[in-house]
Amino acid sequence: MQPDLFSKASKQSAATQPKEIPDASDPSARAAWLRSELNRHNYAYYVLDNPIVPDAEYDQLFRELQALEASHPELLVFDSPTQRVGALALTAFPPVTHSVPMLSLGNGFEDEDVLAFDKRVSEGLNSREEVEYATELKFDGLAINLRYEDGVLVQAATRGDGATGENVTANIRTVRAIPLRLHTNNPPKVLDVRGEVMMYKADLAKLNARQRDAGAKEFANPRNAAAGSLRQLDSRITAQRSLRFFSYGIGLLEGADMPASHSALLDWYAELGIPVCSERAVVRGVQGLLEFYKATSEKRPQLPYEIDGVVYKVNRVDQQLQLGFVSRAPRFAIAHKFPAEEALTTVQDIEVQVGRTGAITPVARLAPVLVGGVTVTNATLHNEDEVRRKDIQIGDTVIVRRAGDVIPEVVAFVPERRPASARPFIMPSSCPVCGSPIVRLEDEAIARCSGGWVKCAAQRKGGLLHFVSRRAMDVEGLGDQLVEQLVDKHIITTAADLYKLGFRALAELDRMADKSAQNVLDALEKSKRTTLARFIYALGIRHVGEATAKELARHFGNLDALLQASPEQLLEVADIGPVVAASITAFFTDAMNIELIEQLRAAGVTWPEHVVENRPRPLAGKTFVLTGTLPTLSRDAAAEKIEAAGGKVAGSVSKKTSYVVAGAEAGSKLAKAEELGVTILDETGLLQLLDSDEQD
């Protein structure tokens, strides 16, 4: 079990906390407080490998101290955090003195920072031409120096304070991506490879699942997991965890010529068998830098690992040497950081929301905070057990994360900032919407409102929104606000009531004009012509998603056969187990659900009869994953062709995946397929496979 380094850091630093935080009116006191605060965070981040604030808050404090020292030079002291790289090494591992210091990079946060960097570089080189830059990713992991002597890995050390790190050779030898011997017959006498040890997001999920099963502490993010794994005293534990490595720089080099450029250095590394990230480019001028930043930002959610920015380096080594270094960073490089995906805020309250199936979900109401470029005021806490496990209380200061389009989540609370007035969340005993009892089955993590859609307006609204959604009945114009009005004004109760709506009832609603009302009626009329699979999915049967609805339609051929199916017959359908079969049976034995189905049929909802084919389907048993943009087929069209031939379309790549169909700008799914050796097809290959199967 991991030691609780979080609380350890809190206890150690408690004495350094002033009773009152000085403000800018007293520059000397403010600078002293900033130095103390940054040193405290440095210790938690670099030494304990368990940061107690997000990077964005640390960066803000660091820049404030830099500005204060610039405007008041007399406040600059030799041991200021602005004059050093990191923190001291633990004594648990032998210290290692780096032959060439491992410096940090300066940070840029806005386009203007990049423009200023390019201007400084051009002036430093006295160049009127656009400078050539190497661009690469800024990984969110642990910086490492790998020393090779005569081609053999002899030592690995952490960055530490930049001058002295920790010897973690035994643990690094367990990272399979790192070669123990370079792939060359003519190795340099000494080569120091600089790079980052990290953990992929999927590997973190697997590790945390094992941690939960063992009753051990989970890791908040991939960086903490990588750092905690690499700094295990028992290397056998490290060997059980999937760590990765990418190289990005060089320290000492003896017995070989230095490559002429940074891009050539990485190409050389790749030839030596040292992992190099493919997400890099050589560009010219500031426009090339910003285009790389934009492209990387767009593909960031699909990457299999965490990054917090990109790095720009003057590509030519002779120009790097000409520009030189400042006290803590090279002049020839800068990190262009993304908007923070983690931030600190406070939990003002914890309320519960009711979903369409009655699921009761605790939601944290947060003091507004900017995360990933979006103001976040709410974050899901998933279920009661999750709240207890993370020990989130009302009044806590918490770390909130928002990555890409992912729903904001509360990662952890900050123990040292918990106020005396904090109070735990208590799950209500009755539904906040309809007052029905909240129940929770023994084998389920989710508590549910027992009122059902008849009693509970929240379940009615959720069920109706699901019914009209694009992949269900696909009724354009019926959004959240309109459905809410229709339910709250008691105009509709069930999905069948939608098809009884009149023009005047719609036109008189808030924010509805005559044209909008007619558009909704036209969309409802159009939706009556659907497919059996869409209709089954639209009913909102618990545990029945799109794929299962398609399998049910394909297997039974018509709705009446499905309505009469026994649990044993349902179990004959692909991918349906006892839990799903029981849920389907329960739905179709409920008299109110049968009445709803008959009302929908009476309203004119219809679909083509599906003929059950007895001949074997050629792609039966094959699982496909679609990624990227195909030249002519939309993803839906490609999926329909695959499913019509009996194949199954999944959302993620695994060892069970038969084919990955990749188009332009394919992301992490393609990389995962290559890693697992899954067969990769382009659109032409898919169509050829379908054609050959049809001929067979």
Swiss-Prot record:
Residues holding Zn(2+): C431, C434, C449, C456
Cofactor(s), names only, from the UniProt record? Mg(2+); Mn(2+)
Q: Name one GO molecular function term.
A: DNA binding
Instruction: Identify the CDD domains for this entry.
Output: BRCT_DNA_ligase_like, LIGANc
One biological process term in Gene Ontology: DNA repair
**Reactions catalysed according to its record:** NAD(+) + (deoxyribonucleotide)n-3'-hydroxyl + 5'-phospho-(deoxyribonucleotide)m = (deoxyribonucleotide)n+m + AMP + beta-nicotinamide D-nucleotide
Q: Supply the EC number(s).
A: 6.5.1.2
Arranged from A to Z, the UniProt key words for this protein are: DNA damage, DNA repair, DNA replication, Ligase, Magnesium, Manganese, Metal-binding, NAD, Zinc
The entry's family comment says:
Belongs to the NAD-dependent DNA ligase family. LigA subfamily.
Q: What is this protein called?
A: DNA ligase
Task: Name the encoding gene, please.
Answer: ligA
